[in-house]
Amino acid sequence: MPTETLQTGSMVKPVSPAGTFTSAVPLRILNKGPDYFRRQAEPNPKRLSAVERLEADKAKYVKSQEVINAKQEPVKPAVLAKPPVCPAAKRALGSPTLKVFGNHAKTESGVQRENLKLEILKNIINSSEGSSSGSGHKHSSRNWPPHRSEATDLHRHSFAESLKVYPTQGRSSPQEGGSHVGRRLLEQSAESFLHVSHSSSDIRKVTSVKPLKAIPCSSSAPPLPPKPKIAAIASMKSPEADPVEPACGVSRRPSLQRSKSDLSDRYFRVDADVERFFNYCGLDPEELENLGMENFARANSDIISLNFRSASMISSDCEQSQDSNSDLRNDDSANDRVPYGISAIERNARIIKWLYSIKQARESQKVSHV
């Protein structure tokens, strides 16, 4: 047997279980004591707050004895005040029957609410069906009287006024008088229908009302040209329609009409003002007097020359293509036709040139006076 194996065997020492425990567990845990392990075994150990920890170490950083003796309590969250309970609720809570059957009462109240909603829906459906069947049944199905205010009445009255169709022509034939009677009967029925309460059936009926169509007038009445005076139209109403007209405080306002002569006069004035502005270049009368009207007339003749053809060839080509047949038939009418005017670009260029010449004339006059 070799000596090396004997030496190694003698060097190996048996390891005791106490030695393994001491080597595995640190020394600082062994020095803690049994209280440390008991605290870890507790399910929810109470943790000190910051105030309590400072209170314990107060002697280290506080010098005065009064502060050391004074104890600071931790701040607690504010407790919310409960709402006051009415005495009826207290009695209900105190009664043993409600405590025992509380859940059953809750379910009963929920069922009652659902039944109430179903009854309301049934009443609405019955009222809508009754309104479609007849007005008598509709009034019997209501459980509350209709309440109308002045604002709603005024709104309905204005809506009924908007449904009315006013006559557009001055004269009216006997057939038109009959049509006016029919219109007013429809208006009266619409007004009587509108004076109802705000229920769901009424709203459905309002939405389903068709707009009243104007009854076409007879073709025997000849068309008349529009007249400038409105009073003449009001005086020529048919005498048959006046007694049937319903009494209402709102006065009718006929639409404003203008005669063709008035419109043409307005257009002519606008054209004249524009032409005068371009002819006189927007100069004041004082400047025109200083320049002299004879000089202005000579320069103005350059601007207002109507014999000069327009620079816009598109409009001239269109006019020539439209009037080509008439030119071939009548040469005299072509000579009498008014020639083309000057385009806006050409006119502006001539105005600028003319103003420049006026400026040069003024400067030359100043030099001559000096």
Curated annotation (Swiss-Prot):
UniProt entry keywords in alphabetical sequence: Cytoplasm, Cytoskeleton, Phosphoprotein
Main localization category: cytoplasm
Keyword Phosphoprotein: yes
One Gene Ontology cellular component annotation held by this UniProt entry: centrosome
One Pfam family, short name: FAM110_N
Sequence segments annotated as region (Disordered): 127-151, 237-256, 317-337
Positions carrying Phosphoserine: 238, 301
Keyword Transit peptide tagged: no
Basic and acidic residues biased stretches: 326-335
Stored InterPro entries: FAM110 (IPR025740), FAM110_C (IPR025741), FAM110_N (IPR025739)
UniProt subcellular location: Cytoplasm; Cytoplasm, Cytoskeleton, Microtubule organizing center, Centrosome
Family under the similarity heading: Belongs to the FAM110 family.
Name this protein carries in UniProt: Protein FAM110B
Gene transcribed to yield this protein: FAM110B
